[in-house]
Amino acid sequence: MSFVPGHISLTFSIWPDKDPLVMGSTGMGIVLSEGVHCAVINEQSTTNENIIIRKGEKVEDPVTLRAIELLGFNNKGLTIYLRHDLPLGSGFGISGASALAACLELEKDLDLCVKAAHQAEIEFKTGLGDVIAIATSLKNHIFPSIVVRHEPGCNGKTKVYPIDEKFLICISGLGRDTSEILSDKEWVEIINSAALGIQYNDVTIRSAIKAGRLFTEKTGLINKNISEIF
């Protein structure tokens, strides 16, 4: 069974490109200790369809299916079992983590898996840098950690900073739909403008959260419930 940690984006700047492996984001985020567990089994079914099972039920997960297709495992009659430590749709990068976890069950070359999962996320507009940040922590065997993505895309320069302090994560409702934001040119301009001037010199959990708060305030992405209590 493979495990892939989740990721919280704190700041990001969008870098579009026709090549999905080059397209991505720069910015900073936290890679968590919790994430996605995956097992892939060939059930010897009568159909060649690959299916996703979550909490005992078949679910739609086009990103994960596309990722394993890119690895060459389309229509193999595979059953992909996913177990999540973190909730979906709450900003934990579960879409990318699920895709990467499934890929790692089928292919042990991390770089190939990262390319497949990242491209699938780009195609479905569910993420830009989650897979890259997560992969950085996996390669260094460090999580929880803060990952700074200095360059976009699969071959972009990144740097990882271990988190030694204890921290608490609170959730207040569901987050905004990622694909909706990435498809809106006005949002892209707002986000890229807000990311200008953010420095990543002295990276600690406190400075990272402070930068994330400033970024969400400048973009208007901050949850109103959180802004009132934090």
Regions from the PLM with identified roles:
Residues 41-46, 108, 137-138, 175-176:
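Short loop segments at secondary-structure junctions
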Residues 1-86:
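ATP-binding N-lobe of GHMP and related small-molecule kinases
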Residues 69, 101-108, 214-217:
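Short glycine/serine- and small hydrophobic-enriched flexible loop segments
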Residues 92-112:
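DPxDG-like acidic metal-binding loop motif
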Residues 73-79, 106-119:
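Phosphate-handling active-site elements
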Residues 9, 14, 25, 29-31, ...:
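FAD-binding core of FAD-dependent oxidoreductases
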Residues 30, 59, 90-98, 186, ...:
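Short, contiguous, pocket-lining structural segments
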